[in-house]
């Protein structure tokens, strides 16, 4: 993190298949400048100064599972080497799978005239999270997809300002579908079939 030259680095562990734990790295001098959030007697220790309830030991321990998971995926694919090279190779495997499975969905959505695909159409230039504006409210569509065995959601996803800038009514919301490295081509085929029925 020091190499980035930033004062604060925030990360959500669940974004890499870990627990719902926020991770924060503060440059020490900057962290000591910020107002403390804890007891007065903990103000001199950086990690205590900004952790008013103390560390959540269970969540911290669970974060080790992220590295264990990457190592398990590496082992399953015969990937060796040091931790950094295993992590890089597993990242590339996961990313290739995400791109492969999301591309047919993007092609399908781009071919419809009743949805507005948000973001790039090229699967290689986006995260495997796909949002579309519909010609109607998104929540009922999400609920109907759920009745068809598809787990997705609808709403604003805390992107209130970006949606407003795109001219999307917050009450109407968007439909969001996500893939991950464990999503199969068959999963996406089922999703497309359900979208055909529901839309």
Predicted regions and their residues:
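Pyridoxal 5′-phosphate
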Residues: 1-199
């Amino acid at each position: 993190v020091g190499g980035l030259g930033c004062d604060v680095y925030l990360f959500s562990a669940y974004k890499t298949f870990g627990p719902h734990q926020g991770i924060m790295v503060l440059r020490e001098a900057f962290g000591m400048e910020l107002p403390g959030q804890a007891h007065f007697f903990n103000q001199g220790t950086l990690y205590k100064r900004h952790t008013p309830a103390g560390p959540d030991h269970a969540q911290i321990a669970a974060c080790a599972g992220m590295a264990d998971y990457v190592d398990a995926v590496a082992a399953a694919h015969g990937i060796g080497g040091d931790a950094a090279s295993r992590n890089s190779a597993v990242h590339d495997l996961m990313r290739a799978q995400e791109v492969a499975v999301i591309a047919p969905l993007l092609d399908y959505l781009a071919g419809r005239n009743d949805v507005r695909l948000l973001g790039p159409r090229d699967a290689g230039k986006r995260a495997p999270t796909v949002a579309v504006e519909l010609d109607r409210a998104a929540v009922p569509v999400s609920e109907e997809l759920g009745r068809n065995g598809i787990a997705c959601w609808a709403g604003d996803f805390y992107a209130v300002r970006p949606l407003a800038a795109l001219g999307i009514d917050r009450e109407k919301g968007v439909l969001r579908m996500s893939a991950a490295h464990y999503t199969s081509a068959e999963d996406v085929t089922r999703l497309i079939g359900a979208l055909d029925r529901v839309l």
